């Protein structure tokens, strides 16, 4: 081993072939910089510093890695030791990485290596795991060692399994790797086992140690995707509406300004902005006519108008209103300054700006004071509508300040002589819809029949379904529970299928004040009320333990109750288009599964309706599709951070898999894809053994050890390029992607959809 620290010459095979000289030098500079940051003043890395830098959850791996990096057994790692070890581990050959992995798994090797320190692996000998004979330790991995490693892998990936399942995983991997059946896994046997997984050996790394690899150089700036042909094609309806909106503003501004050109530039600007505000402040209500928009979704206009972006257009128009109001105010202020400075002016500046004495305006000269009040109200609504307030547990602040739109409209009627004409039709529609919604919701006083408290603070409500409440898969409703907050209505996606006649399901994630109070109230022994009679009539509370087919035993709380609530809806969403698609890709992140749960259940009910059994011979068959469903294929992708979140809908997914198994002869209509982001993948040395064992046991038992489903849960995040390539290669018809989840992931998916020519629809709240 070369002790000069030149990584180009280290290792039995060298690693210059994997790195250019420039990359080599840049990587060494990066490692040196990170080493100095971690090591501190003493210039060496201790075990505790190594653990903190590695960001591993399980100290087992940190201790194993540290022992193998510390070639001189000094109890600390020097810069030279770190460089030599990482050169082989990060940029070395597959055999170098495999030797390291074997030493990690051969637990008793370190004790024996420590006894021989100073002989074979003396100081300056380089990484002992790369140059020493494998037989220095025990030279093999026994079942107890493998079980210890797999147990640490489980903790590292935040997976909890019972001891019996851990024993089964250990046995499955050990029996597969121990080719000669002598009760121990040798280096050659581990190598042969890994070679069954293509690409794993070449890509083995320690993913959690982000400080091991230098940041990639910035890529060359590419053309913004907004300027690509695919973007313009996929967003043509939105772009057309934006162009029409901008053109209308130019027209309104120009007409109003030209009509007052004799009064000066400031008045022209003020009048132009005022005319645009007449339109914006009235039409902004049209974008929130949920019943009208739901009705339009069922017409041909849904193919022309961007109905799914109504909330984004509402927000955009809100920004425009605030901007125009500021310009309008500044222009009038400049005009008042000029008037007050005129010799013949009987009014001072503050009188023109704040009083009714000048007689400016339609009603008792109130234009100036109402204008100031309007600007303050609009700024308040604008600030309280920001995402940092709405999504940080202060939704009530947004809700109550947004109700001041009623006062804004009233002040606008007093402020401008023509605003009432602009508001007449939109205002009638808006208040008519509000009146209908209020009447229907009060007539539809229903009750919460059952509550299930699920993992990750999710509340599952079962509400008695009114006989006239008709909805489609993926629709949402507004819920009001007077015992939580008398005047607050919150939107939630319906997670039950329309074919479910008796109840409506809602799955509510605790993320704000209202949802947290809902969960905590039912979690308490006296739900919703500290003994108040009108809050709850809980009949029974029972706790049941159930095993998720190999997953950990969960403790769920079920409460049967009779709590009065009100519902308003249903309202349509983009997911209504799913059954008109040919190949639908449903992507849910976390609780974003709720609209797709309704859709998947509806699919299950429709398939059950098509299934028939002969009463004589018990032969079963499935008729062709008799409804309007055009679907040829459905890919459902569910991404969760932790294991317990899969429990929300595991029973539904199990039933879907059973139905698919019965229809296997007709082709696989529905494919499930499950991803757990906290789990490490096969390319990570801290998880390769576990993932291999999970694969082997899943093939043996025909079910996943994490969820109990037949579908194998994949670790990490999806590789969207590979996922969409597979979807495109199936050629099942035009692909439409439906997503419900975080805006950050939506942006990523939107870019991939534009690349592959898929239509993208997002659930908005």
From Swiss-Prot:
Binding sites annotated in the UniProt record for Ca(2+) 1: 42, 44, 49
Gene3D superfamilies: EF-hand, Nucleotide-binding domain of ferredoxin-NADP reductase (FNR) module, Translation factors
S-adenosyl-L-methionine recorded as keyword: no
Biological processes per GO annotation: angiogenesis; apoptotic process; cytoskeleton-dependent cytokinesis; defense response; endothelial cell proliferation; positive regulation of cytokine production; positive regulation of reactive oxygen species metabolic process; proton transmembrane transport
Annotated ranges, domain FAD-binding FR-type: 441-577
Induction: Down-regulated by TGFB1.
GO-annotated cellular components: endoplasmic reticulum; endoplasmic reticulum membrane; NADPH oxidase complex; plasma membrane
UniProt keyword annotations, A-Z: Angiogenesis, Calcium, Cell membrane, Electron transport, Endoplasmic reticulum, FAD, Flavoprotein, Ion channel, Ion transport, Membrane, Metal-binding, NADP, Oxidoreductase, Repeat, Transmembrane, Transmembrane helix, Transport
Residues that bind Ca(2+) 3: 106, 108, 138, 140, 145
Annotated Ca(2+) 4 binding sites: 178, 180, 182, 189
Cofactor dependency: Mg(2+)
PROSITE patterns in the cross-refs: EF_HAND_1, EF_HAND_2, FAD_FR
Domain EF-hand, first and last residues per copy: 26-56, 57-92, 93-156, 165-200
Native source organism of the sequence: Homo sapiens
Coiled-coil features, chain-numbered ranges: none
Enzyme class: oxidoreductase
Tissue: Mainly expressed in pachytene spermatocytes of testis and in lymphocyte-rich areas of spleen and lymph nodes. Also detected in ovary, placenta, pancreas, cardiac fibroblasts. Expressed in B-cells and prostate malignant cells.
EC numbers: 1.6.3.-
Protein name: NADPH oxidase 5
């Amino acid at each position: 081993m070369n002790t000069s620290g030149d990584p180009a010459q280290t290792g039995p095979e060298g690693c210059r072939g994997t790195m250019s000289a420039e990359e080599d030098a840049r990587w060494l500079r990066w490692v040196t910089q990170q080493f100095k940051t971690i090591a501190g003043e003493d210039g060496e890395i201790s075990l505790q510093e190594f653990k903190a830098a590695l960001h591993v959850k399980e100290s087992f791996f940190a201790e194993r890695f540290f022992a193998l990096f510390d070639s001189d057994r000094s109890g600390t790692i020097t810069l030279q030791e770190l460089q030599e070890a990482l050169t082989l581990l990060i940029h070395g050959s597959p055999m170098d990485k495999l030797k390291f992995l074997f030493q990690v798994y051969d637990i008793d090797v370190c004790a024996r290596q420590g006894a021989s320190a100073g002989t074979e692996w003396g100081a300056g000998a380089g990484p002992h795991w790369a140059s020493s004979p494998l037989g220095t330790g025990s030279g093999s991995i026994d079942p107890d060692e493998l079980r210890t490693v797999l147990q640490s892998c489980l903790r590292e990936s935040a997976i909890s399994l019972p001891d019996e399942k851990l024993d089964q995983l250990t046995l499955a991997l050990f029996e597969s790797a121990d080719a000669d059946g002598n009760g121990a896994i040798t280096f050659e046997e581990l190598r042969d086992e890994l070679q069954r997984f293509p690409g794993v050996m070449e890509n083995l790394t320690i993913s959690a140690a982000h400080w091991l690899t230098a940041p990639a150089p910035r890529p060359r700036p590419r053309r913004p995707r907004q300027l690509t042909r695919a973007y313009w094609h996929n967003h043509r309806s939105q772009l057309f509406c934006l162009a029409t909106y901008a053109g209308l503003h130019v027209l309104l501004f120009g007409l109003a300004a030209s009509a007052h050109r004799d009064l000066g530039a400031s008045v022209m600007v003020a009048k132009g902005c005022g005319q645009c505000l007449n339109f914006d402040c009235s039409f902004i209500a049209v974008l929130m006519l949920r019943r009208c928009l739901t009705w339009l979704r069922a017409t041909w206009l849904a193919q022309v108008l961007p109905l799914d972006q109504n909330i984004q257009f509402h927000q955009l128009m809100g920004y425009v209103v605030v901007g125009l109001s500021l310009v309008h105010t500044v222009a009038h202020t400049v005009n008042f300054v000029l008037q007050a400075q005129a010799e013949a002016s009987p009014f001072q500046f503050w009188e023109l700006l704040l009083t009714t004495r000048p007689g400016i305006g339609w009603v008792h000269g109130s234009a100036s004071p109402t204008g100031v009040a309007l600007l303050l109200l609009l700024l308040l609504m604008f600030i309280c509508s920001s995402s940092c307030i709405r999504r940080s547990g202060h939704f009530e602040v947004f809700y109550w300040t947004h109700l001041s739109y009623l006062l804004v409209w009233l002040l606008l009627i007093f402020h401008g002589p023509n605003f009432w004409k602009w508001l007449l039709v939109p205002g009638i529609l808006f208040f008519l819809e509000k009146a209908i919604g209020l009447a229907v919701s009060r007539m539809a006083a229903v009750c919460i029949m059952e509550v299930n408290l699920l993992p990750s603070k999710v509340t599952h409500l079962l509400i008695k379904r009114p006989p006239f409440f008709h909805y489609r898969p993926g629709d949402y409703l507004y819920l009001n529970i007077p015992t939580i907050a008398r005047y607050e209505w919150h939107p939630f996606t319906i997670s039950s299928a329309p074919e479910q006649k008796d109840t409506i399901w809602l799955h509510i994630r605790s993320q704000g004040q209202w949802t947290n109070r809902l969960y905590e109230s039912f979690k308490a022994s006296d739900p919703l009320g500290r003994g108040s009679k009108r809050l709850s009539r809980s009949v029974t509370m029972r706790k049941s333990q159930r095993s998720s087919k190999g997953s950990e035993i969960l403790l769920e709380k079920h409460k049967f109750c009779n709590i009065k609530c009100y519902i308003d809806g249903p309202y349509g969403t983009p997911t209504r288009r799913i059954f008109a698609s040919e190949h639908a890709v449903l992507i849910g992140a976390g609780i974003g599964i709720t609209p797709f749960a309704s859709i998947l259940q509806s699919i299950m009910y429709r398939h059950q309706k098509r299934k028939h059994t002969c009463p004589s011979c018990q032969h079963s068959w499935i008729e062709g599709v008799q409804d309007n469903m055009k679907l040829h294929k459905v890919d459902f992708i569910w991404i969760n951070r932790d294991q317990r979140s899969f429990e929300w809908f595991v029973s539904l997914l199990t039933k879907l898999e059973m139905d698919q198994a019965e229809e296997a002869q007709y082709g696989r209509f529905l494919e499930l894809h499950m991803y757990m982001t906290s789990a490490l993948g096969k390319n990570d040395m801290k998880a390769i053994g576990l993932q291999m064992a999970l694969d082997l046991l899943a093939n043996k038992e025909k079910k996943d050890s994490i969820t109990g489903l037949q579908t194998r849960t994949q670790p990490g995040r999806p590789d969207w390029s590979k996922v969409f390539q597979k979807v495109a290669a199936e050629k099942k018809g035009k692909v439409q992607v439906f997503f419900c989840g975080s805006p950050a992931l939506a942006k990523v998916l939107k870019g991939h959809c534009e690349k592959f020519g898929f239509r993208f629809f997002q659930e908005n709240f």
